[in-house]
A protein has these predicted regions:
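Catalytic core of nucleotide-sugar-dependent glycosyltransferases
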Residues: 9-18, 23-48
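Flexible, charged surface loops at secondary-structure boundaries
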Residues: 45-49, 69, 99-104
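Glycine-rich adenosine-cofactor-binding loop
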Residues: 48-68, 76
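Conserved beta-strand elements of the Class I
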Residues: 5, 51-55, 108
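Phosphate-bearing ligand-interacting subdomains
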Residues: 81-139
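Short, solvent-exposed loop/turn segments at secondary-structure junctions
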Residues: 11-12, 19-20, 57-61, 81-82, ...
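Short, solvent-exposed amphipathic alpha-helical segments in soluble enzyme
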Residues: 68-72, 123-126
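Short glycine-/acidic-enriched loop or helix-start segments at secondary-structure transitions
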Residues: 16, 63-66, 118-121
Length: 139
């Protein structure tokens, strides 16, 4: 039979460190990660679609709004009354209730608040939207 044993020293030290490449190399920048996500969204969920919507006009959402290039969302959804009715980077801000139905659009969600995913799912699911079919979280 085989026997398990304990090695004398760690074989791999997997900790957050300022020396990690992902912490110091510009190739790992948030902008580059968003560019990668945009590319794969274009190859998957957004492929063949003439329009989509973005949920989120906060700090995370604005970063996405600045960087959409070939495709831009038709609108951006937010729940802040000071933002709704305005334009951010040329894109109109709407209330969630103004979204087209689940079979009419796709929604990319760019909200970084810790409780946002569950709150947004709680709004989307009862209205017939299904994650990955009708919407996807980006952040």
């Amino acid at each position: 039979g085989k026997q398990f044993g304990k090695v004398a020293e760690p074989l791999l030290d997997w900790t957050e460190s300022p020396k990690r490449l992902s912490m110091r190399d510009p190739r790992y920048s948030p902008e580059n990660f968003r560019a990668l996500k945009r590319y794969y969204l274009g190859q998957s969920h957004l492929r063949g679609r003439s329009a989509f919507h973005q949920w989120g006009a906060g700090e995370v959402g604005k970063a996405w709004l600045r960087e959409w290039d070939v495709m831009k969302p038709s609108s951006v959804v937010d729940i802040n009354p000071r933002k709704v009715g305005r334009r951010i980077h040329g894109i109109p801000v709407i209330w969630p209730d103004a979204l087209p139905g689940p079979d009419e659009t796709f929604i990319v969600i760019a909200v970084g608040a810790p409780t946002a995913r569950e709150e947004i799912r709680a709004w989307m699911n009862p209205r017939g939207y299904r994650e990955l079919r009708d919407f996807v979280f980006l952040a």
